[in-house]
Amino acid sequence: MRQGLVPKKVFFTSGVGRHREMLESFEMALRDAGIEKFNLVTVSSILPPDCEIVQKSEGLPSLYPGEIVFTVMSRNSSNEPSRRIAASIGCAIPKDPVKNFGYLSEHHSYGETEQYAGMYAEKLAENMLFTWTKEKPGKTMNISKTAEVDDEGNWTTVISAAVFIL
């Protein structure tokens, strides 16, 4: 059976950036998350079977600056003073993660706490897995980042990402 570009590992990261320019606030969020030096390609929401979840500190050295890297990313930006923004990734891991795939969900919102946004994303992933398999996941998790726009109205960007390693 043909097997294309299937990630072997994944790590989770998040970041926040602030700047008077929107694009530069995104760059600052990527830097804060530690993934600014890669050419990121966003993909949809499948956690492949037998994909090992590793710490960011283990995953980053496996990647090369300029490399095309696949990611499931949630991103949110605003320059509205005092606006709270959130970006979250939820993950639902099947009971048998070696044989079965799981789900990743992206959630971005306004006004939510980091905990609420993270749990919402986690529930989204859990529901996507359940509606496919009719089974509860073996485990769920999330990564979330929130920030509040400063009083000067500088652009603020938050990101959360599941970063795949082939």
From Swiss-Prot:
The modification Pyruvic acid (Ser) is found at residue 45. The record marks 44-45 as: Cleavage (non-hydrolytic). Keywords: Decarboxylase, Lyase, Pyruvate. Its EC number is 4.1.1.19. Its cofactor is pyruvate. PANTHER family: PYRUVOYL-DEPENDENT ARGININE DECARBOXYLASE (PTHR40438:SF1). This is Pyruvoyl-dependent arginine decarboxylase. InterPro entries: Pyr-dep_his/arg-deCO2ase, Pyr-dep_his/arg-deCO2ase_sand, Pyruvoyl-dep_arg_deCO2ase. Binds 1 pyruvoyl group covalently per subunit. The lineage of its organism: Archaea, Methanobacteriati, Methanobacteriota, Stenosarchaea group, Methanomicrobia. The keyword Cell membrane does not apply. It is an enzyme of class 4 (lyase). It comes from the Archaea. It holds the Pfam family PvlArgDC. One of its GO terms (molecular function) is arginine decarboxylase activity.
